């Protein structure tokens, strides 16, 4: 029997309201015991003194680019970034080439990620065949094959009747629709519609492109009983709309990309195309509302929207591919809120663990006895720099490149096996 003890760490598990200095005994890949001073002579020991010990992080929004665009990232490099960022489970987006609208692609991803053997990779299927927004994909067989949600991420579903049908089907299958909300008639440009787009003379994306679709899909979720999960929420009004539906008891949840908490549209003036993302970085007022939304629990979880693109695809803002990498920077970014006294570490961990687990309906994100021993161990104060040496992605598109970051994952354990060590 393989035994491991994580000793002397400060354990925080929001799923069972557990917080304090404890040892964790892992046996055969499962959580066996959490107690003070566990002694098992034959067990391997990980000394976590001075470190935070919590359930393995879950990221429900990752672009692995595999199959089809493996020059940007692949399942192996993406998995390496994930475990280095503390994520033991990631949900990958279906805008691959070919897209995940058939079971062959699902099986390929599941097999390859298993053979890489670092983190759990849970695929999503497309809402519509070919992500074309017209014909609904075969949800039933995609779910059977292992998809945990459906999304046309990267593109909105413009046709309301298609979205209604998708929510009806998803409701029958008990899975969420993950919703990239941006009406493409109002969001066709490259950055937020506002002072910076005016200053630089750049084409833009209006905030109401997002808000209108959230309102529509909240109504459709109410009508169908389906669960709509709003991806990368980015404006103040979006949050007000989400709160409205939550108060009515509609099944609506949402995530925030930590980059939207750190930066505004003005970051384009510093980082150029590396600050180009869809939905775009918004105004200060929006950024502050998002932070408030985290604090008040209107936002359910962090999700990185890790979206790798090569440097040649990020030269000019006007022509750049949208997206920012984020698996390795999510924890230090979120810790900024903790350091400013806005949220507790417990709240931060909840948003990386049990909350995303609940959204996709998996029994993970917890250290409950008998659960898979997925454990993240981090130092909230360790400083490091994301650069050539530390970056594990094939891409480097982030405004945080070369910046000093505070907070570092020291060990990541998945199913009782160490998959990352600083
Ligand atoms: O900025 C983005 N990049 N937003 C998306 O929705 C898609 C993603 C990508 O695939 O690059
Ligand atoms: Zn998206």
Curated annotation (Swiss-Prot):
Outcome after substituting residue 232 to A: Does not affect activity
Binding residue positions for substrate: 63-65, 95, 278, 309, 322-323
Pathway assigned in UniProt: Pyrimidine metabolism; UMP biosynthesis via de novo pathway; (S)-dihydroorotate from bicarbonate: step 3/3
Binding annotation for Zn(2+): 61, 63, 153, 305
Recorded GO CC terms: cytoplasm
UniProt keyword Zinc, yes or no: yes
Activity control: The monomer has very low activity by itself. Activated several thousandfold by formation of a complex with PyrB aspartate carbamoyltransferase (ATCase).
Annotated cofactor note: Binds 1 Zn(2+) ion per subunit. Fully functional with a mononuclear metal center. Does not require a second metal for activity, although the conservation of the second metal-binding site during evolution leaves open the possibility that a second ion might bind in vivo.
Record field: catalytic activity: (S)-dihydroorotate + H2O = N-carbamoyl-L-aspartate + H(+)
BP-aspect Gene Ontology terms: 'de novo' UMP biosynthetic process; purine nucleobase catabolic process
Cofactor(s), by name: Zn(2+)
Highest taxon above the source species: Bacteria
Residue positions of the active site: 305
UniProt keyword annotations, A-Z: Hydrolase, Metal-binding, Pyrimidine biosynthesis, Zinc
EC number, as in UniProt: 3.5.2.3
Known partners and oligomeric status: Monomer. Forms a 1:1 stoichiometric complex with PyrB. The complex exists as an equilibrium mixture of heterohexamers, composed of 3 PyrC and 3 PyrB subunits, and dodecamers. The complex has both DHOase and ATCase activities.
Entries under HAMAP family matching the protein: PyrC_classI_B (MF_00220_B)
Family recorded in the similarity comment: Belongs to the metallo-dependent hydrolases superfamily. DHOase family. Class I DHOase subfamily.
Job description of the protein: Catalyzes the reversible cyclization of carbamoyl aspartate to dihydroorotate.
Name by which UniProt lists this protein: Dihydroorotase
UniProt source species: Aquifex aeolicus (strain VF5)
Highest classification ranks of the organism: Bacteria, Pseudomonadati, Aquificota, Aquificia, Aquificales
């Amino acid at each position: 029997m393989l035994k491991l003890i994580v000793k002397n760490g400060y354990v925080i598990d929001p799923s069972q309201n557990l917080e304090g200095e404890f040892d964790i005994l892992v046996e055969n890949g499962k959580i066996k015991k959490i107690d003070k001073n566990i002694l098992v002579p034959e067990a391997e020991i990980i000394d976590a003194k001075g470190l935070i010990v919590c359930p393995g992080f879950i990221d429900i929004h990752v672009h692995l680019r595999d199959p089809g665009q493996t020059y940007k990232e692949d399942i192996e490099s993406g998995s390496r970034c994930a475990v280095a960022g503390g994520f033991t489970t990631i949900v990958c987006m279906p805008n691959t080439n070919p897209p995940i609208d058939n079971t062959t692609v699902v099986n390929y991803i599941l097999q390859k990620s298993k053979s890489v053997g670092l983190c759990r990779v849970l695929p999503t299927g497309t809402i519509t065949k070919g992500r074309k927004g017209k014909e609904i994909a075969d949800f039933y067989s995609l779910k059977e094959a292992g998809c945990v949600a459906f999304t046309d991420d990267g593109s909105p579903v413009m046709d309301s009747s298609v979205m209604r049908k998708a929510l009806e089907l998803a409701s029958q299958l008990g899975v969420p629709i993950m919703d990239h909300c941006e009406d493409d008639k109002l969001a066709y440009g490259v950055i937020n519609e506002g002072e910076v787009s005016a200053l630089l003379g750049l084409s833009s994306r209006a905030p109401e492109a997002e808000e209108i679709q959230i309102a529509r899909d909240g109504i459709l979720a109410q009508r169908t009983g389906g669960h709509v999960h709003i991806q990368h929420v980015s404006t103040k009004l979006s949050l007000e709309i989400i709160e409205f539906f939550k108060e009515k008891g509609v099944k609506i949840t949402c995530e925030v990309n930590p980059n939207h908490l750190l930066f505004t549209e003005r970051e384009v003036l510093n980082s150029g195309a590396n600050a180009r993302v869809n939905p775009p970085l918004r105004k200060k007022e929006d950024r502050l509302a998002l932070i408030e939304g985290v604090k008040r629990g209107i936002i359910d979880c962090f999700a990185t929207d890790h979206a790798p693109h090569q440097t040649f695809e990020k030269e000019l803002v006007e022509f750049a591919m949208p997206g920012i990498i984020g698996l390795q920077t999510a924890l230090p970014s979120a810790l900024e809120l903790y350091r400013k006294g806005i949220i507790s570490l417990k709240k931060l961990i909840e948003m990386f663990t049990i909350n995303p687990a609940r959204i996709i309906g998996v029994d993970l994100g917890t250290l409950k006895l008998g659960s898979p021993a997925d454990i993240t161990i981090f130092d909230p104060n360790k400083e490091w720099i994301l650069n050539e040496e530390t970056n594990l992605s094939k891409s480097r598109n982030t405004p945080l490149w070369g910046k000093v970051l505070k907070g570092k994952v020291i060990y990541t354990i998945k199913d009782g096996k160490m998959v990352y060590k600083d």
